[in-house]
Design a protein with these regions (language model features):
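Acidic, low-complexity, intrinsically disordered interaction modules
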Residues: 29-105
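Context-gated lysine
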Residues: 2-3, 10, 37, 69, ...
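Acidic, proline/glycine-rich low-complexity IDRs
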Residues: 94-125
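Negatively charged, low-complexity tracts enriched in Asp/Glu with abundant Ser/Thr
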Residues: 1-31, 110, 117-123
């Protein structure tokens, strides 16, 4: 069994990876790996236990899915730093503005995903 994405799907996934590359490499909360068997795998990391997290592990099927996961992780990181809680769905207006400000450079490079940012505040799938 060898995973093959449609060329357009693979291109959109790799575009998201390229834009978020520094964040992907430096985050301690998840890992993004390639498997010849299933494709890109997103693995959440439990930093307390030092192991794979119980939830959040999946095969990446499209660029939008990966974008949503990365933006969610980034928003949680921002909330950990400046928020009153770590959950972006509970962000105050000021916290939302800070999240939007910090995610803006990524969105500038991925204009097709502009409409997806608000999902972080509603946890819409």
């Amino acid at each position: 069994m060898k995973k093959t994405y449609e060329p357009e799907t693979k291109s959109t996934i790799e575009q998201v990876i390229d834009v978020f590359n520094d964040y992907i490499r430096t985050s301690t909360h998840f890992e993004l790996l390639w498997s010849d068997k299933v494709g890109y795998i997103y693995i959440s990391i439990d930093n307390v236990q030092g192991s794979i997290g119980d939830t959040g592990c999946c095969v990446v099927n499209c660029g939008e899915e990966l974008f949503d996961k990365l933006v969610w992780e980034l928003a949680v990181d921002i909330m950990e730093e400046v928020g009153h809680t770590i959950d972006p769905t509970e962000a105050t207006l000021l916290e939302r503005r800070e999240i939007e400000r910090r995610i803006h450079p990524y969105l500038e490079q991925l204009p097709a995903y502009q409409d997806r940012l608000q999902r972080v505040f509603t946890r819409e799938k």
